[in-house]
């Protein structure tokens, strides 16, 4: 049975920068108010005419280049997204955009947990020998579903894309994972589908659907995150026989700096090992974990063989933790 290694990572964000000062002109808020409560100073937003597929393609190409692979090497492509350009799915469009013509492609939707869920899924395809080279992409454009008059949510979200390449190898790089879902709390974070009646006959109608803006019970989501995430990290590490201090970096979904600080405190992790890029990008949903991984690999803070914890959490409610050793081993 082949081992699984994470051999490349890439990231991409739009050029358009939306700062807290811009938002203070839209709603009653300030840079200090937003930053002190979230850690966010700015976020990147897709401009009109720009597609999520194009953004995801940049991240995917970056990951392949770092791993020394071409799109023709990819056997399977998984796109983790909640905001595809096409409701039928974005993965096929991405496959075409990057020229991965030999790859099977499908979407996986698990909101802000999506990238971790997709990595875990991809690892099983490699481990069973079904596929040898799997490209996992997390990309979202939550700006498309943001109510820019809602101060509670419009300050949080940005757009972005990140990607990682998994390959079969001799030495195991995916050490373990745990995934969870609690549908009883699904109502705490949503983009609801609303429907308008379309008359078809005297006694018959269909519906025309559209998606509303993001709604969130911030207090409940925060409570869930600071309790469930560190607990699952501890369970994952224990199952793998790894102590928290043996992990080089904790790469969590970038939702709120207070959540990151709380998890670090609970795990007794030094602040410098709890990665954060919230100040620059905000909450990019399924893109946040690969984006922060790409940053830390690029600047040398993560090197081949280092243990890293990847953790996603969000709508569903869903949460997942994956322990890996980075790089070609």
From Swiss-Prot:
Its main location: cytoplasm. InterPro entries: ACP_syn_III_C, ACP_syn_III_N, FabH, Thiolase-like. One of its GO terms (molecular function) is 3-oxoacyl-[acyl-carrier-protein] synthase activity. The keyword Lipid biosynthesis applies. It catalyses: malonyl-[ACP] + acetyl-CoA + H(+) = 3-oxobutanoyl-[ACP] + CO2 + CoA. It is found in: Cytoplasm. Its EC number is 2.3.1.180. Keywords: Acyltransferase, Cytoplasm, Fatty acid biosynthesis, Fatty acid metabolism, Lipid biosynthesis, Lipid metabolism, Multifunctional enzyme, Transferase. It comes from the Bacteria. Pathway: Lipid metabolism; fatty acid biosynthesis. SUPFAM superfamilies: Thiolase-like. The active site is at 112, 253, 283. The last Arg residue of the ACP-binding site is essential for the weak association between ACP/AcpP and FabH. NCBIfam families: fabH, PRK09352.1. Belongs to the thiolase-like superfamily. FabH family. Catalyzes the condensation reaction of fatty acid synthesis by the addition to an acyl acceptor of two carbons from malonyl-ACP. Catalyzes the first condensation reaction which initiates fatty acid synthesis and may therefore play a role in governing the total rate of fatty acid production. Possesses both acetoacetyl-ACP synthase and acetyl transacylase activities. Its substrate specificity determines the biosynthesis of branched-chain and/or straight-chain of fatty acids. HAMAP family: FabH. Homodimer. This is Beta-ketoacyl-[acyl-carrier-protein] synthase III. The lineage of its organism: Bacteria, Bacillati, Cyanobacteriota, Cyanophyceae, Gloeobacterales.
């Amino acid at each position: 049975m082949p081992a699984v290694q994470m051999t490349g990572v890439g990231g991409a964000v739009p050029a358009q920068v939306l700062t807290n000062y811009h938002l203070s002109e839209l709603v009653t808020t300030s840079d200090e108010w937003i930053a002190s409560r979230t850690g966010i100073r700015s976020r990147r937003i897709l401009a009109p005419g720009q597609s999520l597929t194009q953004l995801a393609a940049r991240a995917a190409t970056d990951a392949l280049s770092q791993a020394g692979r071409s799109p023709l090497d990819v056997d399977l492509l998984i796109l983790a997204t909640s905001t595809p350009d096409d409701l039928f799915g974005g993965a096929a469009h991405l496959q075409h955009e990057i020229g991965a013509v030999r790859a099977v492609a499908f979407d996986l939707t698990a909101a802000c947990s999506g990238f971790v869920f997709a990595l875990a899924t991809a690892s099983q395809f490699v481990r069973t020998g079904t596929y040898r080279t799997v490209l996992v992409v997390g990309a979202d454009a939550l700006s498309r579903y943001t109510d820019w008059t809602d101060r509670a949510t419009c300050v949080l979200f940005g757009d972005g894309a990140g990607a990682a390449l998994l390959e079969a190898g001799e030495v195991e790089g995916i050490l373990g994972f745990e995934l969870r879902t609690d549908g009883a709390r699904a109502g705490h974070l949503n983009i609801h589908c609303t429907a308008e009646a379309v008359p078809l006959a005297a006694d018959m109608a269909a519906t025309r659907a559209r998606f509303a803006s993001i709604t969130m019970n911030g207090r409940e989501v925060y409570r869930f995150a600071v309790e469930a995430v560190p607990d699952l990290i501890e369970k994952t590490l224990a199952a793998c026989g790894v102590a928290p201090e043996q992990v080089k970096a904790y790469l969590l979904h970038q939702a709120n700096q207070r959540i990151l600080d709380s998890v670090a405190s609970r795990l007794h992790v030094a602040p410098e090992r709890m990665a954060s890029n919230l100040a620059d990008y905000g909450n990019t949903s399924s893109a946040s974990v690969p984006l922060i991984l790409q940053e830390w690999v690029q600047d040398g803070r993560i090197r081949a063989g280092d243990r890293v914890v990847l953790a996603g959490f969000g709508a569903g409610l869903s949460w997942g933790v994956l322990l890996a050793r980075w790089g070609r081993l």
